[in-house]
């Protein structure tokens, strides 16, 4: 899945949430730490980081540096959205008890490449 397709999926999620009373704008085209920002259906400021996986993993993964950057934002609801073959999952990061970080060899960029880095 290329970055253009990922951006289309991100925009589709924003569109669907906006149909449900959210007020979001897509901002995943650049180098932002999140893919959408705006207000929840209850009018609370929020940001959403989105991941689209081709394979199902029981344990959902968010890179530690992205998590830390999201958690550093003040007075905003932080949401992690994951789409995979088994469904769509939204996690409210503000109060979620996170496990200890685990180092994994992952692609060096958003797009799947053969180059791997050890990431938290």
Regions found by a protein language model. Name each.
Residues 71-97:
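Nucleic-acid nuclease catalytic cores
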Residues 90-120:
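Intrinsically disordered, low-complexity terminal regions enriched in charged/polar residues
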């Amino acid at each position: 899945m290329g970055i253009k397709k990922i951006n289309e999926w991100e925009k589709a999620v924003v569109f669907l949430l906006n149909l449900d009373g959210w007020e979001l704008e897509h901002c995943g085209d650049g180098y932002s730490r999140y893919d959408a920002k705006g207000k929840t259906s209850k009018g609370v400021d929020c940001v959403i980081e989105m991941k689209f996986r081709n394979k199902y993993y029981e344990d959902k993964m968010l890179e530690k540096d992205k998590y830390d950057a999201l958690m550093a934002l003040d007075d905003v609801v932080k949401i992690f959205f994951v789409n995979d073959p088994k469904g769509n999952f939204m996690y409210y990061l503000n109060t979620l008890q996170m496990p200890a970080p685990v180092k994994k060899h992952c692609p060096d960029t958003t797009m799947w490449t053969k180059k791997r880095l050890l990431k938290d």
